[in-house]
């Protein structure tokens, strides 16, 4: 069944772009005492900075954010008129579904962006959208890995060392043809184990294209990440 959403299951003909930002998580690893998306970086919340980056890219027509139910009014005060605020769900997937349901019209493409990647440059967002317009139906920004990666078992015993050349660290926003994203969410309903939206698309056989990421699109997860973000903003 197609997810409960305001979007039609066909790709929109208008060429417009919507972005959804699931921001209802608690952010326990950041240990800030408030939902992570509402933590401030030099006076502006991560959520406000993430939404501003999307709109400053000039390629996003509307943004829908999903926040904790008790933070909806606060988010509405923080965000501009081009952003719609809805109450999020129990997990990220549920929040994306609720945000999709509130997307107006029938956009051709949908971006899914992490509020915690608050410093993502507008140029990166434009790069993802351009790849969609060039004909790719699923696009993720990513960076090469510089550290050696080990596969380990439950006891910490190394099972192998994957070749770094074929590995990438994936960022957001991840972009999709609207019909493909809806189909992926419909097929993945009730299925656990997907860590990003591109994984859902891969699950239904969709091909995902990688474009160059950006170091500034790092995910703010710990206090050290937050300190780095504040240092960058204040420089």
From Swiss-Prot:
It holds the Pfam family IspD. The record marks 164, 219 as: Positions MEP for the nucleophilic attack. GO terms for molecular function: 2-C-methyl-D-erythritol 4-phosphate cytidylyltransferase activity. It catalyses: 2-C-methyl-D-erythritol 4-phosphate + CTP + H(+) = 4-CDP-2-C-methyl-D-erythritol + diphosphate. It is an enzyme of class 2 (transferase). Pathway: Isoprenoid biosynthesis; isopentenyl diphosphate biosynthesis via DXP pathway; isopentenyl diphosphate from 1-deoxy-D-xylulose 5-phosphate: step 2/6. InterPro entries: IspD (IPR001228), IspD/TarI (IPR034683), IspD/TarI_cytidylyltransf_bact (IPR050088), ISPD_synthase_CS (IPR018294), Nucleotide-diphossugar_trans (IPR029044). Coiled coil: none annotated. GO terms for biological process: isopentenyl diphosphate biosynthetic process, methylerythritol 4-phosphate pathway. Its EC number is 2.7.7.60. The record marks 29, 36 as: Transition state stabilizer. Gene3D superfamilies: Spore Coat Polysaccharide Biosynthesis Protein SpsA, Chain A. Keywords: Isoprene biosynthesis, Nucleotidyltransferase, Transferase. PANTHER family: 2-C-METHYL-D-ERYTHRITOL 4-PHOSPHATE CYTIDYLYLTRANSFERASE, CHLOROPLASTIC. Catalyzes the formation of 4-diphosphocytidyl-2-C-methyl-D-erythritol from CTP and 2-C-methyl-D-erythritol 4-phosphate (MEP). Belongs to the IspD/TarI cytidylyltransferase family. IspD subfamily. This is 2-C-methyl-D-erythritol 4-phosphate cytidylyltransferase. It comes from Mycolicibacterium paratuberculosis (strain ATCC BAA-968 / K-10).
